[in-house]
Swiss-Prot record:
The keyword Metal-binding applies. It catalyses: D-mannonate = 2-dehydro-3-deoxy-D-gluconate + H2O; D-gluconate = 2-dehydro-3-deoxy-D-gluconate + H2O. SUPFAM superfamilies: Enolase C-terminal domain-like (SSF51604), Enolase N-terminal domain-like (SSF54826). Has low dehydratase activity with D-mannonate and D-gluconate, suggesting that these are not physiological substrates and that it has no significant role in the in vivo degradation of these compounds. Has no detectable activity with a panel of 70 other acid sugars (in vitro). Belongs to the mandelate racemase/muconate lactonizing enzyme family. GalD subfamily. InterPro entries: DgoD-like (IPR034593), Enolase-like_C_sf (IPR036849), Enolase-like_N (IPR029017), Enolase_C-like (IPR029065), Mandel_Rmase/mucon_lact_enz_CS (IPR018110), Mandelate_racemase_C (IPR013342), Mandelate_racemase_N_dom (IPR013341). Substrate binds at residues 127, 275, 296, 325, 329, 352. This is D-galactonate dehydratase family member Dd703_0947. Mg(2+) binds at residues 223, 249, 275.
Length: 417
């Protein structure tokens, strides 16, 4: 029997849900044995494909796919400079695919290789939004009827109307918050506008309404999306204390991370942090100094399952729980990777989940099953998910930059998305 080795690495781009996705397929010299991994960096999808096809593939071909740690370590430093989001996503796609292969070789789901089941199902949180407090409440009630016990509550997206129409923003903000945003009447620069001051004043009103109407029997999450100043984030966290959030997500930007210490000193609102981090070492001082309660981690952007499991274990030792990023711009393969980590991590906190349409489930057979706000992965060897490449070709990627990243404040200043 010939020694197992990698014979081909390719990138599959597809958008069956209307969002550009990148999936890596690592093939071996054993007939029918291959692995899949998520390398989705939607905002730079073609750059990731180039990184995989032109750099990762030549690096990997001929190597033993079972040497996951060695491949991860050597690939991570092969470009000398490291931990950029493009190469990390490329590395993630490969890393997940190697875990998929190893699970298939062992005849076990990946969660068994990571230590085995810690729970029967995976509690999920879903997203709710609305133009005003009543609309948000109605949408939460609909999710509660579906069985969800955790919901993320936003009003007008992240402090705006998700549009470049300033009049519409003013109308929605005035309707929802009785606040008139300060906006420039001239030379409107194209972009997605929001008002951070109006937003910060509206959020406590939203949660006051929701707790008055829905009580404390459901868990609420709110995402600041790093869109306010550090001082405003501290004020917001303090003001939200009476409403007992499950957590407040990304209250400050990575560039302002030192402010978390002051926030922690002044507020008991639980904090989740790290959606924009690209290196597991970025969480270390936050975990060591007890500045966060949840690791908010985009698994593909830090390099895949291998570093994510290490981060989860380090967090466990320090009383911090997991909250892997689960938006619509990760592939179902990435969703499964998150959930295998969830199943095997005793310090699991919560899993974000974005519903999948029929096209996604057809292109990716083996997607997790959702029942009453819980997710269940199958027990097939590996990650338990596949891809129909013929169907995937019917949903080409456009490679454009998503409009929501073009954020501006009412005076036209470019801002963090």
């Amino acid at each position: 029997m010939s020694k197992l080795k990698i014979t081909n690495v390719k990138t599959i781009l597809t958008a069956p849900g209307g969002i550009d996705l990148a999936v890596v397929k690592v093939e071996t010299n054993e007939p029918g044995l291959y692995g899949l991994g998520c390398a989705t960096f939607t905002q730079r999808i073609f750059a990731v494909k180039s990184a995989i096809d032109e750099y990762m593939a030549p690096f990997l071909i001929g190597k033993d796919p079972t040497r996951i740690e060695d491949i991860w370590q050597s690939a991570a430093v092969s470009g000398y400079w490291r931990n950029g989001p493009i190469m990390n996503n490329a590395l993630s796609g490969v890393d997940m695919a190697l875990w998929d292969i190893k699970g298939k070789l062992a005849g076990m789901p990946v969660y068994e290789l990571l230590g085995g089941k810690c729970r029967d199902g995976i509690p999920l949180y879903c997203h709710t939004d609305g133009g005003d407090e009543v609309e948000v409440e109605d949408n939460i009630r609909a999710r509660m009827e579906e069985g969800y016990q955790y919901v993320r509550c936003q009003m007008g997206m992240y402090g705006g109307a998700g549009t470049d129409d300033l009049k519409l923003i003013a109308t929605q903000l005035a309707r929802a918050k009785n606040i008139q945003p300060k906006r420039s009447p001239r030379s409107k620069t194209p972009g997605i506008y929001f008002d951070p001051e109006a937003y910060a004043k509206s959020v406590p009103r939203l949660f006051e309404h929701l707790r008055n109407k829905l009580g404390f029997g459901i868990e609420f999450i709110h995402d600041v999306h790093e869109r306010v100043t550090p001082v405003t984030a501290i004020q917001l966290a303090k003001t939200l204390e009476p409403y007992q959030l499950f957590y407040l997500e990304d209250p400050v930007a990575p560039e302002n991370i030192d402010w978390l210490r002051m926030l922690r000193q002044q507020s008991s609102t639980p904090i989740s942090m790290g959606e924009l981090f690209v290196n597991i070492n970025e969480w270390k001082p936050l975990i060591d100094n007890k500045l966060i309660d949840y690791i908010r981690c985009h698994v593909s952007t830090i390099g895949g399952i291998t570093p994510a499991k290490k981060l989860a274990v380090y967090s466990e030792l320090n009383g911090v729980r997991t909250a892997w990023h689960g938006p619509g711009d990760i592939s179902p393969v990435g969703v499964c990777a998150n959930m295998h980590l969830d199943m095997s991590s005793p310090n699991f906190g919560i899993q974000e989940y974005t519903p999948m349409n029929d096209a996604l489930r057809e292109v990716f057979p083996g997607c997790p099953e959702i029942d009453q706000g819980y997710a269940y992965v199958n027990d097939k060897p590996g990650l338990g998910i596949d891809i129909n490449e013929t169907l995937a070709e019917k949903y080409p990627c456009d490679g454009g930059i998503p409009s929501w990243t073009m954020a501006r404040t009412p005076d036209g200043t470019a801002s963090r998305p």
